[in-house]
């Protein structure tokens, strides 16, 4: 990932980097990998994420 620093404005470049990492899901992966997750908990989490995604898609379809 490449971020341009304009006018030596490091703070703005850091904000842009953080925003891009957030959109890519980097922080979520780091959080999940920082602690061991039991296989049963992993299956449960993935199932909940799938249900949430399906509900979100159905909600968007109903809007249109």
Curated annotation (Swiss-Prot):
UniProt-listed GO biological process terms: translation
Residues in the signal sequence: none
Protein name (database record): Small ribosomal subunit protein bS21
Family membership: Belongs to the bacterial ribosomal protein bS21 family.
Domain of life from the UniProt record: Bacteria
Cytoplasm in keyword set: no
NCBIfam families given in the database record: S21p
Swiss-Prot/TrEMBL keywords: Ribonucleoprotein, Ribosomal protein
GO cellular component, one term: ribosome
GO molecular function: structural constituent of ribosome
Any Pfam family: Ribosomal_S21
